[in-house]
């Protein structure tokens, strides 16, 4: 069935086909019954007419056979008065001619008639049949020589010594009886013997011809069954009724009717039935159309509501008014529950979208702040690196001075004073270095805590995106259950689920980057703590050097030993400075990586904000 047809039209079409089929079957069944009834009535009618005609013909011949038999008996008793007996009024009025064929070849006839010269009855077939018969017998129709008319002879043997007496019966009466049967203009009757020869027929040209000449294509059998035959382009129904009680004559009354005329009533009935069927089908289809329109009204209301949600303002606050508890009422309740569930889901998605947007803004703000702190940390790290370089240069200078002190003992005081100044500068540099290391450690700790906060925020984003994904999946499932009507919801739900999935992936990437930043920050904190410890050691050594330089004037004799100690301490200080320099460079690299990670986080948060805005726009298309 065409998919573009409306459901009500499909119902109406199916109902129309059922009604048409039912009426067609009813008409065909009635046609079958009417045909059988007409055929049965026709068979009964023809059988009755055949039996009645057979009785009339038998009655026609029985009386005359009695007359001939009585005449034969009377002549046998009184052969001398044969001609007188043949002239009785009863015989003259009943027969066309009465005659006597004698065994000596003589022939008497009443009324008198001149026979051909040399006429010998003994050579005639009727004489031979009469002499051979044990009782009265009938001849087939033949032309009487005296009257030149078609007659049937009734013969009876007088005796073997006298001859045969007979009476010719004109066929006019028999023809009148047979031709009187026209069955209301539908057909005719005819007389035929058991050999199929036609004895009497309305068409005189067919008399004495066989049935095969009349019906060459299909010669009917002489039975009482109704047989269809073709004759002159017409279909005719034939039946035969035997004429019983006639001596030596096996005759049948053939009844022939035109099939089209016989079943003309059936054609009229068919036309009336077709007209009635068409009128009834039109009326029923019209009533069905009105009934379907009334019954489908709740569905039309539901369709308009769904179209308003799908193509209009997306108003999810509308509900259907249920007025019945039938299938449409159940469907309406289901639709209201579905819209209520979608309404709740859209509200939750809207709220979650606002939260995601706020979280994204907070993450962006935190990322910008972290970027600023990272820049500050980078600047200070560069300052620490410069100070470390100065500290290294100072240590090298101390080593040179210590070597010169060993070589130039004479200028120990001057060198001690210079060493005192260098130590003071060293102490000041160490103090600055210690302060910078403490500050860097605090900044890195702050960065670490910020990354922890960012990780918590990302966990919130991940949880929200997972909830959004579940809500979108539930909405898609409910839309799939709604079929074609929920296709718009399915598209929106699928878009929301994709956005949530992308948000979750971005949050996971940011989480991974932040975890790497946290690891780097923890390593930087450990390194700065170690650097601070080394710085404190250097400060202690520098203080010791200062104390020793304070007493250099009174302990000049110990300059060589002290210079060795200073050289050793200076070498250690140089190693520590180099280590600190390496740590500072590594901190700087980690800080750069942190900046790059923060930039990636910022970009991801910007994408998250855009997707949240898009989701908010989609949710805003519904009225909640």
From Swiss-Prot:
GO terms for biological process: chemotaxis; signal transduction. The chain crosses the membrane at residues 11-31, 272-292. Disruption phenotype: Deletion of the gene causes significant reduction in GABA chemotaxis and reduces root colonization. Pfam families: dCache_1, HAMP, MCPsignal. Keywords: Cell membrane, Chemotaxis, Membrane, Methylation, Transducer, Transmembrane, Transmembrane helix. Residues 352-588 form the Methyl-accepting transducer domain. Residues 293-347 form the HAMP domain. Residues 36-254 form the Cache domain. It is found in: Cell membrane. One of its GO terms (molecular function) is transmembrane signaling receptor activity. Its main location: membrane. Gene3D superfamilies: Methyl-accepting chemotaxis protein (1.10.287.950), PAS domain (3.30.450.20). PROSITE patterns: CHEMOTAXIS_TRANSDUC_2, HAMP. Chemotactic-signal transducers respond to changes in the concentration of attractants and repellents in the environment, transduce a signal from the outside to the inside of the cell, and facilitate sensory adaptation through the variation of the level of methylation. McpG is a specific gamma-aminobutyric acid (GABA) chemoreceptor that recognizes GABA over a wide range of environmental conditions. Contributes to attraction to and colonization of plant roots. Belongs to the methyl-accepting chemotaxis (MCP) protein family. This is Methyl-accepting chemotaxis protein McpG. The gene is mcpG.
